[in-house]
């Protein structure tokens, strides 16, 4: 192969002259020529369009929108639930207020004729204020429960226990009960006094029946 790159020697030159290399032969016998990078590739001959070349990721196909889109419920319809609505608090409040106010008003009625009219009128005005605040939702649950206990003690003539509940309400809930609790306190005192008088009258009525007349012996 080396002989291909060497020109034939000059006959006129000496035997020891260096050979002359032929660069033209090197370029002619070199490897296959490369296509320049700037040269465009010819379009295909069949005429079919070429797909555009993209360097990004392939597009993602989105599913078509569902035809059964959620729609709001029609007007006037409510979702069906298995929970029953709670009982009306108004009815429960009216029941409790009658359980408390009715015994107090009855106790005030018992005091008429034994208590001064001015005192009875003041107690009646305080009880009316209690009813108004109770019905208007201005009293808390603890106050209502303690008033129910106070009435029970009053009905059983447990005056000291009723008075203790009255004092606890004045200490713990003075802002709620201060306007009408004075009348309840006075009613407890008047009812206690009336009960003591009735007890004395009963005792005075029973004692003469048990007394014996001197010198008179009751038949056995």
Curated annotation (Swiss-Prot):
Gene Ontology CC, one term: nucleus
Misc note: Appears to be the first example of a new class of functional RNAs also able to encode a protein.
Bias type Pro residues, positions: 55-76
Organism domain of life: Eukaryota
Similarity-based family: Belongs to the SRA1 family.
Region annotation (Disordered) ranges: 1-89, 194-220
Transmembrane segments: none
Phosphoserine modified-residue sites: 48
Disulfide bond keyword on record: no
Subunit structure: SRA1 RNA exists in a ribonucleoprotein complex containing NCOA1. The RNA also forms a complex with PUS1 and RARG in the nucleus. Interacts with AR.
Biased composition (Basic and acidic residues): 194-206
Keywords annotated in UniProt: Activator, Apoptosis, Cytoplasm, Nucleus, Phosphoprotein, Receptor, Ribonucleoprotein, Transcription, Transcription regulation
GO biological process: apoptotic process; negative regulation of myoblast differentiation; regulation of transcription by RNA polymerase II
A Pfam match: SRA1
Compositional bias of kind Polar residues: 208-220
Protein name: Steroid receptor RNA activator 1
Known function: Functional RNA which acts as a transcriptional coactivator that selectively enhances steroid receptor-mediated transactivation ligand-independently through a mechanism involving the modulating N-terminal domain (AF-1) of steroid receptors. Also mediates transcriptional coactivation of steroid receptors ligand-dependently through the steroid-binding domain (AF-2). Enhances cellular proliferation and differentiation and promotes apoptosis in vivo. May play a role in tumorigenesis.
Protein localization: Nucleus; Cytoplasm
